[in-house]
């Protein structure tokens, strides 16, 4: 393999971890007392991954069922992280109505990249949620 190919491969491998941006690793989602957190939603997103998962945050405990998000969080989440062995189900309308999507373990720094139907995205579109862990 040529040195140029090796260099390009090395650069590609180094760039992959940055795709998570500033989001925490799913295994690190814990409260200060060490108890488990199911998911964490963030209000601010950015075209640059390094600036995502910042600003106000909403931590969701395992088993949380919120058909109506608090008024300051309804349709405002633009990044989220789901803890290990957990799943977050979201709805686009209050009362668990409208479009739905399940997010499994992982970091989702830009919800603009996840389609909600033909014309929309999940950025600033979450009005209800249910989070469960296994």
From Swiss-Prot:
InterPro entries: Syncollin. Induction: Down-regulated in small intestine upon fasting. Residues 1-21 form the signal peptide. Contains intrachain disulfide bonds. Specifically expressed in pancreas and also detected in secretory granules of parotid gland (at protein level). Expressed in pancreas, spleen, small intestine, lung and neutrophilic granulocytes (at protein level). Expressed by epithelial cells in duodenum and colon. Keywords: Cytoplasmic vesicle, Disulfide bond, Exocytosis, Membrane, Signal. Disulfide bonds: none annotated. Pfam families: Syncollin. It is found in: Zymogen granule membrane; Zymogen granule lumen. One of its GO terms (cellular component) is zymogen granule membrane. GO terms for biological process: exocytosis; regulation of calcium ion-dependent exocytosis. It is a peripheral membrane protein. It comes from the Eukaryota. Syncollin comes from the Greek word meaning to glue together. Monomer and homooligomer; most probably hexameric. Interacts with GP2. According to PubMed:10753942 interaction with syntaxins shown in PubMed:9244306 is physiologically questionable. Functions in exocytosis in pancreatic acinar cells regulating the fusion of zymogen granules with each other. May have a pore-forming activity on membranes and regulate exocytosis in other exocrine tissues. This is Syncollin. The lineage of its organism: Eukaryota, Metazoa, Chordata, Craniata, Vertebrata.
């Amino acid at each position: 393999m040529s040195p140029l190919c090796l260099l390009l491969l090395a650069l590609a491998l180094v760039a992959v971890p940055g795709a998570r941006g500033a989001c925490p690793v799913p295994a690190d989602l814990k409260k200060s007392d060490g108890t488990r957190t199911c998911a964490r939603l963030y209000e601010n997103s950015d075209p640059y991954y390094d600036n995502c998962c910042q600003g106000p945050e909403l931590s969701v405990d395992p088993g949380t069922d919120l058909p109506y998000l608090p008024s300051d969080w309804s349709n405002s989440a633009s990044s989220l992280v789901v803890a290990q062995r957990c799943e977050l189900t979201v709805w686009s309308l209050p009362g668990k109505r409208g479009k739905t999507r399940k997010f499994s373990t992982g970091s989702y720094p830009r919800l603009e990249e996840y389609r909600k139907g033909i014309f929309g995205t999940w950025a600033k579109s979450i009005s209800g949620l249910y989070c469960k862990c296994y």
